[in-house]
Amino acid sequence: YNPHNKTYYMVTTNVGVGNFFVKTQDPFGEWSDPIMLPEVTGIDPSFFFDEDGKAYLVNNDDAPDNKPEYSGHRTIRVQEFDVNADKTVGPRKILVNKGARPEDKPIWIEGPHLYKINGNYFLMSAEGGTAGWHSEVIFRGDSPTGKFTPWKNNPILTQRQLDAERPNPVTCAGHADLVQTREGDWWAVFLACRPINNTFENLGRETFMMPVKWSEDGFPYMTQGDDLVPVIVRREGVKRDESATFGNFEMNDGFDGQTLGMEWMTLRAPATGLYSLSQTPGYLTLKCDSVSASEKKVPAFICRRLQHHKFECSTRMLFCPQSKAE
């Protein structure tokens, strides 16, 4: 959110197409069409809106001169963003080359975010890839364009060194973002996995959150040493919402409403026109066609995410194909 023009931005990467953003002054209303960022190569773009009205975009990019010294050698770069022209301007500058400890040849410095906290600028990035070596590292500087110095106790979040046989393990933790509550507390949201049998991850990457601590020398961190990422975080004064769909629960959808519930998902984009709740009341009718899941199109496919390692589900299906393509 940019308070200077009262505008919300969502910026991301469409792999194979490029980086783009959409914007609005009402997040519950209409958003703009995608606005491409052709000068921004690489992935994982993130906006930073400074107190002086200037804006910046940071992201993961290639090694200097596109000449990597090893596999996974990447950089974090920054460029000023013109909020009036909706485009990046000026030179692209390298903020981080390789990672927090270049001598160790770290891989995949990515997912950067810029913050200004208590007069200091912080650059936070994921490092180590998204598997078991996943982590988060932090740098501090005097301006959005650097120079940034890594914290001596990086990483600020990881579970890579812990015993794989520990109970209720959380693994692959990284790609974090920071948020401050109205009360002034800092929290982190990040990606991690809950493996089954300490090996497999049938739930994929999930979103976690935990409170942020601050070091004596003024750096934020989530874990140090053998600190565990908790499966459940309890906060004083906050009552658990028993109606939420976590823990053991049962649900049934009779498809008797006017719209699908928020838990239902489609592939790539909304499947508008490919399903109906009114054609046969009490049923979800899929309008099959010849689109396969491997094509860059929207198939007649509706699903919901797995939330547990073990579960049971069933559905009643009436299927009368009219052609081989169905």
List each model region and its residues.
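Carbohydrate-active catalytic/glycan-binding domains of CAZyme proteins
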Residues: 1-326
